[in-house]
Amino acid sequence: MSNHTHHFEFKTLKKAWKASKYFIVGLSCLYKLNLKSLVQMALSALAMITLVSLTITAIIYISTGNTKAKPMPTPTIQITQQFQNHTSLPPTEHNHNSTHSPTQGTTSPHTFAVDVTEGTRYYHLTLKTQGGKTKGPPTPHATRKPPISSQKSNPSEIQQDYSDFQILPYVPCNICEGDSACLSLCQDRSESILDKALTTTPKKTPKPMTTKKPTKTSTHHRTSLRNKLYIKTNMTTPPHGLISTAKHNKNQSTVQNPRHTLA
């Protein structure tokens, strides 16, 4: 195509050059014959023709340069994508049927199969091909589901079942008429009030703790004073036995003295 266009342009330029030659020769002949008005008209027409031809050639060259500069589009082929979790499960009948779906050649429409199992999701894309080119749709984001643990399904031994526990309604004793079961369950409002009054204990206000540890100097001073008082009392008050013996000796001396005087 490019060689054909260049050959066509060369032919047109050659014809224009020949026509301009003939036109110049004709103008020179008219100038020799003293026809100045006709010469001026012819020159103005020639100038207009040359300007038009130059603009046309410039447009042609610019268009051809742009076509050469544009790169040719290359065919793009995309590969089928498959998202699969790292922890794969053993194949089962359901998984095998869902993962291995048969394709329908080059004219098969776009299909999207999702297989959801415990903790995993499989995405399979079959792409539509047309004339050797495959175009894939935008790939969806795979959302991982946390694995279901067996501990949640089986309750632990520590947990207790409180379904058997029932709260009995209030039954007054006035309704019961000789029924032992009713009397065992009934309650008097006065008894319940008394029980509550007896069971309620007033809260004790804690006293502020203001204990001061005695210093060594104060304890020593107290003990020294006690020892001094104890020593003084022992020195001033003699024992009872000594006082009685002293009195007895004085009495005997007074009794013996008048005898000596009489003698």
Swiss-Prot record:
UniProt modification remark: May carry a lot of separate O-linked carbohydrate chains distributed among serine and threonine residues. Palmitoylated.
Region (Disordered): 87-111, 127-158, 200-223, 238-263
Chief site of localization: virion
Keywords carried by this UniProt record: Disulfide bond, Glycoprotein, Host-virus interaction, Membrane, Secreted, Transmembrane, Transmembrane helix, Viral attachment to host cell, Viral immunoevasion, Virion, Virus entry into host cell
Family indicated by similarity: Belongs to the pneumoviruses glycoprotein G family.
Subunit structure: Homooligomer. Interacts (via N-terminus) with protein M. Interacts with protein F; this interaction occurs on the surface of infected cells. Interacts with protein SH. Interacts with host CX3CR1; this interaction modulates host immune response.
Name of the protein in its database record: Major surface glycoprotein G
Organism expressing this protein natively: Ovine respiratory syncytial virus (strain WSU 83-1578)
